[in-house]
Amino acid sequence: MNSLSEKEINGQLFYLSKEAVKTIVLNSRCGLVSQIKKYNKLYSSIDITTNSNFSPLLCVYRKASPTFIHSKNSNGFDEDSFKKEINPATNALMSLCLLELEDYYRKFKDIDNTIFSINTLYKSLSKDQLDFYSKNLRNREGVFVDKKNVLENNLKNFSLVDKDKKFKFSDQSFMMIAYYLYSIKNPDDDISHSYKEFSLQILKMFCDFKDEIYNCSLDEICKVILSLNIFYDYNNNSDAIDLIADLTDYIIGKFDEKDYYIDSLDTTCLFCIVLTLSYKHTKIMIFSEKSTEVINRLYTLYDEDKGSFYKLSSKKEIKYSCFDITFYILAFIVYQNNILFSNEYKILISTLYKKFIINSGLITSWPDAPTLDDYERYRGLSLKSADMVEETYFRMPNIPSPTNTGIAPIFNKSINYNKRKDSFSNSKVTFDSYKNFFNFFLYIYLFKEEYMKELNLIESDTSITSDKHNSDNNDSNELNTDSISNTTKEDENSSTKPNSISNNDNTSNNSPLIEDIEAILFETKNDLNETNNSTDIL
């Protein structure tokens, strides 16, 4: 197999993420499903009043089997396999995917109404999701926490209870981005100002309780810093950049306290990604120097002759988590593009991508490329043969499609690699929503602009970047602590009210975000480290 260019790799990962998000969010039923009929005018490509596949998610559950079950009444993932826990970060990442993809689908206006209608659908659905989160995924003190649905019927009725009293700063940080991104993607929406204020209120919480973040695990702090870097990419907020600088400086010392290369390869790779992004935004040299040190150490794990990288283990069979693989490859891509500005690691990236992502079984299936009569297949959406994009920009030919396998295109939770046999295996195919939406969002966020430029969709169009770098340095000084509670009144007459689904747990609807966070921190301080010490929050 010939070497793939980084442009092809990035294009394939963006395309996979775009299509996988659409499949999971609209067809899996793996979560609480919004009212379907209200989307009838928004999604014109199918008759959703009779199509049993269409099931837009208000929230996504923690785990499920990704195999589609077909019955007379409904199609989707097997409901018996659902682990009906609802994690805030996972759901924020799901909404962020929809919001980022609005830019792509908006380009089809007046060209292909079927594809363009997805833009309108995602805008409406993401609004419904964010409204649902603020009303149902917070505890009595107003902090986002893990919830569990204790009722069997997930389509018509639900009852959410707190999974436990613990909370994660990373859950709050990804929610912060989601509410802010909606506000700048949809500035004319009446609710956008309240969402923006709510987001900045979460940022203020991080400033006020920065010392408590220091008590968290390295993995948890890295996720908070990642969120802050993404947030800063949308808003050059002075509080955000100060937090990025302080927390990144802190984790450099924390990283050196033990050998994370042995214990937590995924955390080490995430640490490297975070260092690179923090350097990109702050230009603090120690961040670049430490990132270079880590990337050089990660490179020593790579065996060029066998085209593999090995976790530091004496075992003949090595278990790789999904994040071990995706973060390892992404660390080199991000470092190469933001510090080296060269293709020094081109061979490593291409080799490991083909072996560990394409050929290992890590991906269950891969969406078919756009057909030859599809506007998405052509640069400038022209349908001209001279503008046709090669299939390798969307997928590799040797990986089965969802149509062939009956399985949604997802990342498996983990795979095993036998060093002696140089072969992969996995015992069970499982959809882990956190791992998947984390990967999907990173690929969409990092590669969307490059993908759209390759298709000549933003050649002279600045709309995709106009949302970013909106300097609101003074926003964090004037916060409305009732901003989210006001959303119920402001949106009372909206035709897209997710609370129209019966809800038996509305105790947090009117809670300001940080009403009593001091009490929460005191109550959970003894187990906060225990909560965050796991690199897998699920």
Where are these regions (language model features)?
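Glycan-recognition and catalytic cores of secretory/periplasmic carbohydrate-active enzymes
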Residues: 1-538
